[in-house]
Amino acid sequence: QPKRCMYLRDNEVKGVSALQHIARELYTGKKPVYEIERMQPARLVPKIERPDIDALFLPAGQTKALFFMGKGGVGKTSISCMTALYIAQKGVKTLLVTTDPAAHIGEVLDVKVGSMPENITDNLFAVMVNQQEAFQEYKERILSEARGRYSEDMLATMEEELNSPCTEEMAAFDKFIQYIEDKDYEVVVFDTAPTGHTLRLLDLPFDYAKQVEMMVSAAESREIKETAQNRFRDIISTLRDKKRTVFSLVLYPESTPIMESYRAMLDLKEAGIETQLVVANMVLPEEVCTNNYFKNRRHMQVKYLEQIK
């Protein structure tokens, strides 16, 4: 049995005063009372432009990649799974990929998802990128190119460079690029980690260049060098191509997830990537808001929906 219950508020938890008030309720066991409408009556939900989802998500001759980003807990996993199922039901062969070690797509789909693509239902497959396995595979691929061409001292230096903290993330990035390049799937949906981690992955093409150069310098064949360099350029081009890659932000209408999503959008823009869809999750329908608790919470949400617009 829980020793204390933390009740969902009718408003966001923000500021010292609000935290102090909630702490008193939490540790005294006093339940919150919603006797009045504390907030100004909400205006109508702002009219939000609805994009043509099929045009946005369905492929047009090339593999399409869909990335869902956002603060932890906003519903990325559920929305990624729903999106993948929606596309698969259209007869499109779809792969759902998670790069977040804490993701629960297997629990949402009610199936076991491992490090190899598993068939979930008609046209839908799912896979979880095991970062440790991806790291070992990535590291070995680079070192195998260098063995027999460099001294043991040089190989040791390269291995030390590959053991840097960001290489594991680079390996995960390289793995999901492989899925995009894989012609077996028409659409690849990525249930990504919380925003900061995802943006770190999206910064990798620029750090990745250094390790591409390692592979290039280790290769004697001019053809191998050109292939590695062209692949790197293609990765950047694919991420920036709105027809091939769609970045979506998932949030709920409160201050913190909105600000985090806004910063992510600006960071993407700086990298030459446009956010094409914003999903506002957990919005209360007006018809269920029949008491002060729900009315207050909806008033807050409508205010933030206006900001999102």
What does each model-identified segment do?
Residues 76:
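Conserved lysine of the Walker
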Residues 1-63, 240-245, 252-309:
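C-terminal lobe/tail of nucleotide-utilizing enzymes
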Residues 162-163, 247-250:
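Short catalytic-loop micro-motif centered on adjacent basic/acidic residues
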Residues 89-93, 243-248:
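Short, surface-exposed connector motifs at secondary-structure boundaries
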Residues 72:
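The conserved Walker
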